A protein has these predicted regions:
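Hydrophobic, aromatic-rich transmembrane alpha-helices
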Residues: 1-4, 37-51, 175-190, 312-314, ...
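Transmembrane signal-anchor hairpin modules in multi-pass inner-membrane enzymes, especially those
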Residues: 1-78, 84, 111-118, 185-195, ...
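Loop-to-helix entry and N-terminal half of a specific, functionally important transmembrane alpha helix
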Residues: 8-16, 199, 361-362, 372, ...
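Aromatic-anchored transmembrane helix interface
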Residues: 60-71, 83-108, 115-124, 128
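Alpha-helical transmembrane segments of multi-pass inner-membrane proteins
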Residues: 117-144, 163-233
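Long extracytoplasmic/lumenal interhelical loops at the membrane interface
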Residues: 141-146, 150, 296-366, 383-391
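Transmembrane alpha-helices of multi-pass inner-membrane enzymes
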Residues: 179-182, 405-458
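A membrane-periplasm/extracellular boundary helix in multi-pass inner-membrane enzymes
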Residues: 228-294, 318-319
C-alpha cells in the first residue's frame, strides 16, 4: 500500500480541491471530503506494511493519551447532544486530528514525508496565480458591488470561501508562514541560495499582506528568528551568525513596516469618514478591539478576542460546575454548522470567534488543559539536538532534517493563535496543516532516534 500517495491525497484534498470547489460552486458539502479521507486513513493503518518493529519511547507513548481527549469530547457530546451532533462536531473540529496518531504509529516513513513536503512546495506555487486572479478580478468586482468597506477576506488562494463574502484568509497566511519557516531553515542548512530564500519569503509575505493576515505579519519575524537560532539534528551547525541574524532582523523589520503602511493605507481608503485620524493611527486603532474585555460587535454579536475569556469565566458554569470543567459537547458554539450549536442563541452572542473559546465551552477547562499540555509535550520532545554527522548524510537527508525547526516554530504559531482565531478548531485547511506538521515532526524524530541507535550498535 502506497501510504505516501494516500497522505498526498489528504493534502491536495484539504489544501486545494475542496477549497477551490467550494469557492467556485458555493457548496460547503465539499468540506466533508477531508473528514471522510481522514477516517479512511485511520482504517487503512492496520494494513500498513511495516519494515521494522514499531518502537515508541515513553514520550511518544504519553502522546497516545490524545485518544483520552477524543473519548472525553465524543462521550460528553454523545451523552449531552446525541449522535448526529456528535458526528457533525467530530467532523468539524477533531476528525483531522486522526492524522496525528496515524503518523505517530508509522503510517508514513521519513522518505514519504520528504515527498509530501515537496508537494507542499508546489501547492505554494499554485497560490501565486490564484491570489493574483483574486486581487485583479475578484476584489475589484466585490468592491464595485458592495463598496470599499466590503473587500476584506477576499484573497483566500485555494483555501476556500465565498468570492463575495470572504473566506479562509487566515489559513492562507499560516500556510505562507510555514513556507517561510521551511525555506529559511533550508537556507540555514546550506540547501538553497540567498536568491531562492529571498524569493520565497518575499512572495509568501506579500501574499500575507494581500490577504491582510495581521497575526502572521506581526509574528513572522519572531518565528523566523526562532528558526535561525534553533538547534539542528545536524552536528556542526552554528547556533547563530550575528551578522546574518542582524541582516534578517533588519530585512523583516523593513518588511513589517512596509506591510503596516500598506494595510494602514488600505484601511484609510476603506474608512473614508474616519475623521482626522492618520493612516497608521487608524491601523493601530483597528487592533484595539482585540484587547477590549467588553467588546461585542453590535451587528453580528461576535465577541472580541479577550472578551471571549471573560465571558466564559462569567458564564461557563451556566448549567453547573461539571460543564465548566468538561464542557457542553462538540459543536455547541459553532454558529455556521449544519446543526448550529445551542449556546449562541442561549446567550445571544457568537462564542466561536477564537479556538480557545471553542475549547473552553465544548470540552471544558480540563479538556482544554489536556489539549494544550499534549501539544506542548509533543513540541518539547520533538525539539532537535545535534546528533548526526553531516558527512554521513545525503542532501535529501539534510533537507528532511532541516524541516524540524520549521515544524516546531509552526506548531508554536498555531498554539499562539488559539486565543486569537478560530482556525484551529473550525477550518479544515488549518487543521490538516497543524496535525500533519506535528505528525511529520514525530516521524522525523523517530527516524533520527533509530539512526542514532544503529550507530551506537555498530
Amino acid at each position: 500500500m502506497n501510504s505516501a500517495l494516500i497522505m498526498q491525497a489528504n493534502l491536495l484534498l484539504s489544501l486545494v480541491i475542496c477549497g477551490l470547489a467550494q469557492y467556485v460552486t458555493g457548496i460547503t458539502a465539499f468540506l466533508w471530503l477531508p473528514f471522510l479521507l481522514a477516517i479512511a486513513t485511520l482504517m487503512l493503518l492496520p494494513l500498513q506494511t511495516r519494515y521494522s518493529p514499531l518502537r515508541l519511547d515513553y514520550q511518544e507513548k504519553v502522546l497516545l493519551l490524545y485518544s483520552g481527549l477524543l473519548v472525553l469530547a465524543l462521550l460528553g457530546t454523545l451523552l449531552q447532544q446525541g449522535g448526529m451532533v456528535t458526528i457533525i462536531g467530530f467532523k468539524n473540529e477533531l476528525a483531522l486530528s486522526l492524522l496525528l496518531p496515524c503518523l505517530l504509529l508509522g503510517f508514513c516513513r521519513e522518505s514519504q514525508i520528504y515527498r509530501i513536503m515537496k508537494l507542499v512546495e508546489w501547492v505554494f506555487y499554485l497560490q501565486i496565480p490564484v491570489v493574483l486572479f483574486q486581487v485583479l478580478v475578484v476584489v475589484p468586482k466585490r468592491v464595485a458591488m458592495r463598496g470599499e468597506f466590503e473587500k476584506w477576506d477576499s484573497v483566500v488562494g485555494t483555501f476556500g470561501g465565498d468570492p463575495m463574502g470572504g473566506g479562509n484568509t487566515g489559513a492562507l497566511g499560516f500556510f505562507c508562514l510555514l513556507v517561510m519557516l521551511i525555506k529559511l531553515s533550508e537556507f540555514r542548512h546550506g540547501l538553497i541560495s540567498r536568491r531562492s530564500v529571498a524569493f520565497h519569503i518575499l512572495a509568501a509575505f506579500a501574499i500575507c499582506v494581500l490577504a491582510e493576515v495581521k497575526f502572521v505579519i506581526l509574528l513572522s519575524p519572531l518565528l523566523l528568528a526562532w528558526v535561525w537560532l534553533s538547534p539542528s539534528y545536524v552536528r556542526g551547525m552554528k547556533s547563530y551568525d550575528l551578522k546574518r541574524l542582524l541582516l534578517i532582523a533588519l530585512a523583516m523589520t523593513a518588511l513589517v513596516a512596509v506591510a503596516v503602511m500598506v494595510l494602514a493605507a488600505s484601511y484609510s481608503s476603506a474608512f473614508e469618514g474616519a475623521g482626522q485620524q492618520g493612516a497608521i493611527a487608524l491601523f493601530i486603532d483597528s487592533l484595539g478591539y482585540i484587547f477590549d474585555p467588553n467588546h461585542i460587535n453590535p451587528e453580528t454579536g461576535e465577541l472580541g478576542r479577550v472578551t471571549t475569556l471573560f465571558f466564559w469565566a462569567s458564564n461557563g458554569d451556566h448549567h453547573g460546575l461539571s460543564n465548566l470543567l468538561f464542557g457542553y459537547g462538540l459543536n455547541t458554539t459553532n454558529h455556521g454548522s449544519t446543526l448550529p450549536g445551542f449556546l449562541n442563541p442561549l446567550f445571544n452572542v457568537l462564542l466561536d470567534s477564537t479556538s480557545l473559546s471553542v475549547l473552553l465551552w465544548e470540552v471544558g477547562l480540563m479538556g482544554t488543559l489536556i489539549f494544550i499540555a499534549l501539544i506542548v509535550l509533543l513540541l518539547w520532545c520533538c525539539r532537535p539536538r545535534p546528533l548526526l554527522d553531516r558527512l554521513l548524510l545525503s542532501t535529501a537527508d539534510v533537507r528532511l532534517l532541516s524541516y524540524q525547526p520549521a515544524f516546531i516554530a509552526f506548531g508554536i504559531a498555531c498554539l499562539l493563535s488559539l486565543p486569537y482565531s478560530q482556525l484551529l478548531m473550525l477550518i479544515p485547511v488549518q487543521q490538516f496543516l497543524f496535525y500533519f506538521v506535528l505528525g511529520a515532526a514525530l516521524v522525523i524524530r523517530s527516524s533520527v532516534r533509530q539512526a542514532t541507535r544503529s550507530c551506537e550498535v555498530s
